[in-house]
């Protein structure tokens, strides 16, 4: 695999973030299964929980291969912990619809956006395990699609409306923007634009949830730009 020596640690740290996201998704899907309205949804969520656990192990293996010294690192991302907190609060209220919005639609959308970008880079670098990577990405797409269908069915049945979902999504989307901002130095170290990654997250959202306002990331200078501004002042 043609990964530059100076790219290994940033990519490993990015995978560490994804690993922790997969563990959060695993815990959430198991809790959601207990709230599922029917046996088919329950089976899907339990299957998702198992898949998320496998994904976390896959990311661990990739981290161990790229930068073994960083295996077991905990990403310092207060936004991810805050995301976990408000998601747990929704689970405690038995609010299945909000948890589907937060986990399957928004968080899986973030993961899918990042994985899609990473996959493009890995293909260019002739990375191994292409079939495994494609399966992982397909499963993420399946989880995301499940959440969208569940919410669209709830809207069709009058149990919730798009305006309510957009309002509830605001805090979660703000936190995903903060996560990308916190990782911006990693993106730039592998010649990627964090603003483009943040905007990708919006592209994976359903039309009824997208906001016309640009994400917070697009209004922020990049880490490199910030350093240049400081140097000039």
Segments predicted by a language model, with ranges:
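Non-heme di-metal
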Residues: 1-225
């Amino acid at each position: 695999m043609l990964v530059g020596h100076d790219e290994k640690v940033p990519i490993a740290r990015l995978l560490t973030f994804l690993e922790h996201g997969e563990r959060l998704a695993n815990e959430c899907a198991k809790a959601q299964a207990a709230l599922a309205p029917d046996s088919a949804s329950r089976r899907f969520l339990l299957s998702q929980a198992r898949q998320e656990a496998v994904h976390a192990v896959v990311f661990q293996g990739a981290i161990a291969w790229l930068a073994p010294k960083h295996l077991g690192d905990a990403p310092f991302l207060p936004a991810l912990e805050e995301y976990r907190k408000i998601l747990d609060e929704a689970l405690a209220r038995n609010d299945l619809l909000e948890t589907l919005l937060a986990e399957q639609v928004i968080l899986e959308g973030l993961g899918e956006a990042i994985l899609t970008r990473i996959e493009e880079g890995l293909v260019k670098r002739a990375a191994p395990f292409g079939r495994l990577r494609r399966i992982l990405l397909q499963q993420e797409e399946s989880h995301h699609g499940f959440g969208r269908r569940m919410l669209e069915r709830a809207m069709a049945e009058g149990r919730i409306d798009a305006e309510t979902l957009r309002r509830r999504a605001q805090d979660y989307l703000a936190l995903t923007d903060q996560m990308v901002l916190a990782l911006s130095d990693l993106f730039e170290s592998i010649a990627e634009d964090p603003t483009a990654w943040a905007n990708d997250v919006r592209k994976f959202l359903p039309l009824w949830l997208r906001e016309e306002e640009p994400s917070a990331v697009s209004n922020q200078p990049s880490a490199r730009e910030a350093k240049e501004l400081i140097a000039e002042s």
